[in-house]
Amino acid sequence: MKYIYIKTWGCQMNEYDSSMIITLLEKNNQYSLTKSAENADILILNTCSIREKAQEKVFHQLGRWKKIKNNNPKVIIAVGGCVATQEGKEIFKRANYVDIIFGTQTLHRLPKMIDEVEKKRKLSIDISFPKLEKFKYFLAPKKKGYTADISIMEGCNKYCSFCVVPYTRGNEISRPCDDVLFEISLLAKQGIKEINLLGQNVNAYQGPTFNGKVCYFSELIRLVAEIDGIERIRFTTSNPLEFTDDIIEVYKDTPKLVSFLHLPVQSGSNKILNLMKRSYTTEDYTSIIKKLTIARPDIQISSDFIVGFPGESEIDFEKTIEFIKNINFDMSFSFIYSARPGTPASNMNDDLDLKEKKRRLYILQERINIQTMLWSRKMFGSIQSVLVEGVSDKNIMDLYGRTENNRVVTFQGSSKMIGQFVNVKIKKVHTHSLKGELF
């Protein structure tokens, strides 16, 4: 038996890809997963290029693994993910002890690439974009726990000026509807209760069906809701441009779809949205939220924000803060702008100093934290449906689970409840977590 060690950085899509890699290697090459890099025969780094200095982070990690390879030259080092797709053979030029470089769309070829390296002991590289080929090699991953991420589409056609996704994941491709439903059915039989549908632009999903028709995202959600055993549905990440009325209608008639939506806006200034090439305005975004609130009055919204984008004035930033207040976001992921090589925004004049960017980020995050706490306080005394995920790390007498709006809640109960939905009355609130008792 040989052992693989995999380190994963980045988004939920990368986590999903890593689970596919593990399943493929365990099946095809009879490898077993190890938690110790020092004990591994194959070291796999699944990378992310979304943030600043992503490339340097990769080489720092490879430098640490070089010591392992020096002690055991037979160890195979493989680099995959978005940095691998972006950098290609440049990785080998800086780290010539790397054996395999594979892309986001070629991870299914990893077993064959490993065989080649073991036989020939020379670099194997494949960062091509074969459409949907990797899903033809799909093996339902064995899931631990009661929630699962499911990739339904990949890539993006929007080419926002700051984003590398179209270059590292390719253009939008949707998995066949029947394949998605089959995978979810298998997971439901394993005891999975909650499904999170994944895509870089998930609501642009247009999956072909066995009878030659197209299944749109709204229809897919309804079909997933019909699968026995699936009790809760989430999705991420969506784009305002594709948030059409038929998707909003799903919130009216599909109670299994949670009353929580992550809908990235990036800025509250129309000028900055235009520079970002987001192709919508704050008015467009506000209209979507109003329609959603009518369809599902208790819905809560989270978002993404970039501060310090080239050209962002103090007035633009103030508009973003005002927009955050007006929409009343519950949560957000917020970052300082960092230029990504090869994107149009990387050629823009970025003259705002880092100190000012950090100040703006602090103000934005403080504003969001205030709103998050206010949303949490509204939950005090309420009865929440909670999917029990396990025993709390902080207190073995407590169980923990998540509410629809993605807050962790702890409460006392029997371990027999793990994997079940229970009603919990909220007795104590914190900004991002809750304390309750069975109701």
UniProtKB/Swiss-Prot annotation:
Lineage top rank: taxon: Bacteria
Record-annotated MTTase N-terminal domain positions: 2-119
Binding locations of [4Fe-4S] cluster 2: C156, C160, C163
Disulfide-bond pairs as recorded: none
Pfam name, any one: TRAM
Main subcellular location of this protein, as a coarse class: cytoplasm
Known catalytic reactions: N(6)-dimethylallyladenosine(37) in tRNA + (sulfur carrier)-SH + AH2 + 2 S-adenosyl-L-methionine = 2-methylsulfanyl-N(6)-dimethylallyladenosine(37) in tRNA + (sulfur carrier)-H + 5'-deoxyadenosine + L-methionine + A + S-adenosyl-L-homocysteine + 2 H(+)
Cofactor field: [4Fe-4S] cluster
Subcellular location: Cytoplasm
Residues of the TRAM domain: 377-439
Domain Radical SAM core: 142-374
Keyword field: 4Fe-4S, Cytoplasm, Iron, Iron-sulfur, Metal-binding, S-adenosyl-L-methionine, Transferase, tRNA processing
EC number(s) per entry: 2.8.4.3
Binding residues annotated for [4Fe-4S] cluster 1, in chain numbering: C11, C48, C82
Role: Catalyzes the methylthiolation of N6-(dimethylallyl)adenosine (i(6)A), leading to the formation of 2-methylthio-N6-(dimethylallyl)adenosine (ms(2)i(6)A) at position 37 in tRNAs that read codons beginning with uridine.
Family the UniProt entry places it in: Belongs to the methylthiotransferase family. MiaB subfamily.
Protein name: tRNA-2-methylthio-N(6)-dimethylallyladenosine synthase
